[in-house]
Amino acid sequence: MEILFVLFFVFVTVSGDCGVVTKDEWDGLTPIHVEYLARPVELVIIQHTVTSTCNTDAACAQIVRNIQSYHMDNLNYWDIGSSFIIGGNGKVYEGAGWLHVGAHTYGYNRKSIGITFIGNYNNDKPTQKSLDALRALLRCGVERGHLTANYHIVGHRQLISTESPGRKLYNEIRRWDHFLDN
């Protein structure tokens, strides 16, 4: 009985962690290879896709599938690059997830979680639903031991030469408690 419970707990923790829409649920491809991330992680990197936004489950899932296909087919990544992707519908989509190294920020992938917002946030503000989803994901990440309690949030632009996560999203996360201004 104890072994069955442990197996069930591990399955639930990995596949449905923090209310994330799993790859199976958004019809994602299986990664070609995985490398495990040392946890808990101290750094969270926020990005944007610079694509159109989405507000429905179907539209967001399609964009996530398109990103995964582009990353795997054109960039030769093992999987979608981001750890998580957040839609304007307020849902968080599984990318590399909490357990696997992503391919989102050169030089930082093995020591961070990359969270990407679907849309272009240079001129548009992210939806309140998407911001609430990020807060809930981060809170859950700490509770489940994926993130350190004193984790830091940075914008992609702070680490490489890019406008990501866009001016409006960057200005939003700069006001958050865990933001690291460097």
Swiss-Prot record:
Domain of life assignment: Eukaryota
Swiss-Prot/TrEMBL induction comment: By bacterial challenge.
Quaternary assembly: Monomer.
Family named by the database record: Belongs to the N-acetylmuramoyl-L-alanine amidase 2 family.
GO molecular function annotations of the record: N-acetylmuramoyl-L-alanine amidase activity; peptidoglycan binding; zinc ion binding
Coiled coil regions, renumbered to chain: none
Tissue: Strongly expressed in fat body with weak expression observed in hemocyte. No expression detected in gut.
Natural source organism: Trichoplusia ni
Span of the signal peptide: 1-16
Pfam (any one): Amidase_2
Protein name listed in UniProt: Peptidoglycan recognition protein
PANTHER family named among the record's database cross-references: PEPTIDOGLYCAN RECOGNITION PROTEIN, PEPTIDOGLYCAN-RECOGNITION PROTEIN SA
Positions of disulphide bridges: C18-C140, C54-C60
Job of this protein: Binds specifically to peptidoglycan and triggers the propenoloxidase cascade which is an important insect innate immune defense mechanism.
UniProt keyword list: Disulfide bond, Immunity, Innate immunity, Signal
Residue span(s) of domain N-acetylmuramoyl-L-alanine amidase: 39-166
InterPro entries to which the protein is assigned, alphabetical: Amidase/PGRP_sf, Amidase_domain, Peptidoglycan_recognition, PGRP, PGRP_domain_met/bac
Gene Ontology BP terms: innate immune response; peptidoglycan catabolic process
